[in-house]
């Protein structure tokens, strides 16, 4: 059975194409997306850190307000990452460990009749963002994941993670999986993002711990 799956009818700039995976391994941290303004998550430092928690994002549009329940236009996730400030020979800030479980509940994003489910198999890098407007802390991290619906694996992913104080509805989160063209990102400060490219949480909470 072919592992090619194309999802059409996807709103805004979000596209998904689930394709066969490559045998090559790329452990390099991914660059922020091009083609738009990015005023946060450009300056980083390797330092001990820990980010924990989970949440819900009602994207699109990614504001603090929840979409109508019947629409199923939202995403949920659980995620954590821990780093001790170690750097490899290429200057990459190494992660000690981490996890990500991501579910996109939008009907148009279903794969094989089920919500799109992304599962991290390896978290390789984590760096503290020193320029993001996240009052308690911000982290850019990522690694490799698997599409649970298809078994497609060894896909690079990165997330932008923002703890913007309490309550959690001021926090933000964004994800990108370039090899399948999947992104959930927000770009309008004061409307749908506390710090580009993160989208406001409509549920849950992110907790930044500067050391562990």
Annotate the PLM regions:
Residues 153-176:
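A short, surface-exposed beta-strand/turn
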Residues 179-212:
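Edge beta-strand at a domain terminus
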Residues 10-18:
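Bacterial N-terminal signal peptides
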Residues 17-44:
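Bacterial Sec-dependent N-terminal signal peptides
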Residues 68-160:
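Predominantly extracellular/secreted and cell-surface proteins with exposed
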Residues 44-65, 141-145:
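Tryptophan-anchored aromatic micro-motifs
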Residues 1-10:
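Bacterial N-terminal signal peptides that target proteins for export
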Residues 29-37, 53-55, 141-149, 175:
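Mobile, glycine-rich extracellular loop/lid and propeptide segments
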């Amino acid at each position: 059975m072919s592992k090619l799956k194309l999802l059409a009818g996807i709103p805004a700039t979000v596209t998904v194409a689930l394709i066969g995976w490559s045998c090559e391994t790329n452990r390099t941290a991914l660059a922020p997306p091009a083609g738009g303004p990015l005023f946060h998550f450009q300056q980083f430092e390797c330092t001990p850190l820990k980010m924990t928690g989970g949440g819900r994002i009602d994207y699109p549009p990614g504001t603090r307000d929840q979409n109508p329940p019947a629409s199923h236009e939202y995403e949920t996730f659980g995620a954590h990452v821990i780093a001790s400030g170690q750097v490899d020979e290429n200057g990459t800030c190494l992660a000690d460990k981490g996890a990500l479980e991501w579910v996109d509940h939008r009907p148009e994003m279903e794969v094989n009749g089920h919500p799109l489910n992304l599962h991290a198999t390896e978290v390789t890098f984590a760096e503290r963002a020193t320029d993001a407007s996240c009052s308690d802390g911000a982290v850019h991290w990522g690694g490799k994941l698997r599409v649970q619906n298809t078994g497609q694996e060894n896909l690079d992913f990165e997330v932008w993670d923002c703890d913007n104080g309490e309550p959690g509805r001021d926090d933000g989160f964004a994800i990108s999986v370039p090899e399948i063209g999947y992104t959930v990102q927000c770009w309008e400060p004061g409307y749908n993002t506390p710090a580009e490219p993160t989208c406001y949480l409509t549920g849950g909470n992110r907790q930044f711990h500067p050391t562990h």
